[in-house]
């Protein structure tokens, strides 16, 4: 305690160390931060529910006491080294920030490319310095997001003028949806307004088409917990919660169960190929989408929407990719009802989400290319983690050598 300007007391749960003649207070403080101190402290802990130490524990500790002049030298040297560490840390943060800004600037040139030739030119510029640009997890994640953005904009693979345009595909899906409504297999919904010019985030390539999310999927809510189910025959089933539905993958580490009426099991059944979309949570959770890719029976909670694709011509993984893109995330952020740190969307807002649909053959090519890029990014991350681990081992070895 330095320069205390007023009379003060200390609480009973604190231990006061008074100044002792021939000891430098700063040296004592250095000792109190050392491994030698903490090792002795842990060995002297009493109690299990709430571990604690007392003055007797401190009294029994071994305290290495050098001559006064050496204490002063130690304090001076430690302070010099700590200042150096702070400077290195600050320099590292500045370098990382500058590096990330450079990466983001160069990646933006890719998404801003006006044509395939310009994209190839900008990519070549990045490729020349690939090993020096993508050396952090943040830069690799930025690369991954840029590739995703290029994919949904139709800039990842060249267009083939011989491909059937997406407009023809959407006509067939509309006919099939109308038949399903007529047969009573899906409910007819109140029509939504068409996509406005303000809602279109970018210009589509030739052969692509904008549609509403509800144009290609039948959206259903899930099981509501806490219902009165007295005198009904129940079965116990597993169900999916918001925590299970991540952005582009499933987290099935903890799958809970719920009782529902036996006659409702088909209503809430999630089948392979269904899309799962989160209703809410924190602002970054809203609209999180993944594909159910398993054969076993499971249902969805009411905070997770189920989207069943109409027909079999649209790849569910394309819709998953687009719904997780920056454009859909921006849509959900603007459409959602937001309170402090929380946000949610309703079924109507999900129905009205604009989606870009490419020709079927092009969608297949995009997904193959996207998977290749994602695998590359994961390999880069593993190599980076391995290199960082090696650096840590080397630093530990050098530190041990210096100490010993």
What does each of the following model-derived ranges do?
Residues 1-11, 33, 229-237, 249-259, ...:
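Short, surface-exposed loop/turn microsegments at beta-strand edges and helix-strand junctions
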Residues 1-3, 194-199, 214-229, 243-275:
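Sequence-specific dsDNA recognition surfaces
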Residues 6-15, 46-65, 297-305, 314-317, ...:
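A short glycine-rich beta-alpha junction/loop motif
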Residues 17, 23, 209-239:
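Extended boundary segments
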Residues 68, 72, 83-104, 108, ...:
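Non-catalytic DNA-recognition/assembly elements of restriction-modification systems
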Residues 164-168:
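Terminal amphipathic helices with adjacent charged low-complexity linkers/tails
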């Amino acid at each position: 305690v330095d320069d205390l300007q007023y009379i003060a007391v200390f609480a009973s749960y604190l231990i006061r160390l008074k100044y002792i003649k021939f000891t430098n207070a700063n040296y004592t403080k250095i000792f109190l931060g050392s491994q030698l101190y903490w090792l002795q402290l842990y060995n002297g802990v009493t109690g299990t529910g709430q571990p604690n130490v007392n003055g007797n524990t401190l009294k029994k500790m071994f305290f290495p006491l050098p001559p006064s002049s050496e204490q002063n030298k130690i304090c001076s040297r430690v302070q010099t080294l700590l200042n150096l560490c702070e400077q290195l840390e600050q320099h590292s943060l500045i370098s990382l920030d500058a590096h990330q800004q450079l990466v983001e600037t160069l990646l933006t040139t890719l998404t801003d490319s006006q044509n395939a030739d310009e994209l190839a030119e900008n990519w070549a510029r990045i490729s020349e310095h690939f090993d020096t640009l993508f050396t952090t997890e943040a830069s690799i994640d930025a690369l991954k997001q840029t590739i995703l953005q290029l994919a949904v904009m139709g800039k990842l693979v060249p267009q083939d003028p011989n491909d059937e345009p997406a407009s023809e595909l959407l006509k067939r899906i509309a006919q099939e949806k109308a038949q399903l409504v007529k047969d009573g297999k899906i409910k007819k919904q109140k029509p939504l307004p068409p996509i406005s010019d303000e809602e279109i985030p970018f210009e589509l390539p030739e052969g692509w088409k904008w549609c509403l999310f509800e144009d290609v999927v039948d959206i259903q809510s899930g099981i509501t917990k806490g219902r009165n189910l007295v005198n009904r025959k129940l079965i116990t089933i597993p169900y999916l919660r918001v925590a299970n539905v991540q952005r582009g993958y499933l987290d099935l580490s903890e799958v809970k169960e719920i009782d529902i009426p036996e006659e409702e099991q088909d209503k809430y059944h999630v089948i392979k190929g269904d899309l799962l979309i989160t209703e809410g949570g924190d602002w970054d959770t809203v609209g999180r989408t993944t594909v159910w890719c398993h054969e076993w029976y499971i249902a969805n909670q009411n905070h997770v929407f189920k989207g069943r694709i109409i027909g079999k011509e649209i790849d569910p993984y394309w819709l998953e990719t687009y719904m997780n893109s920056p454009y859909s995330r921006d849509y959900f952020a603007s459409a959602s009802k937001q309170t402090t740190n929380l946000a949610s969307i309703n079924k109507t807002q999900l129905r009205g989400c604009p989606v870009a649909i490419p020709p079927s053959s092009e969608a297949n090519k995009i997904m193959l290319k996207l998977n290749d890029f994602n695998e590359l990014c994961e390999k880069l991350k593993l190599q980076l983690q391995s290199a960082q681990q090696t650096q840590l081992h080397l630093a530990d070895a050098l530190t041990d050598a210096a100490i010993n």
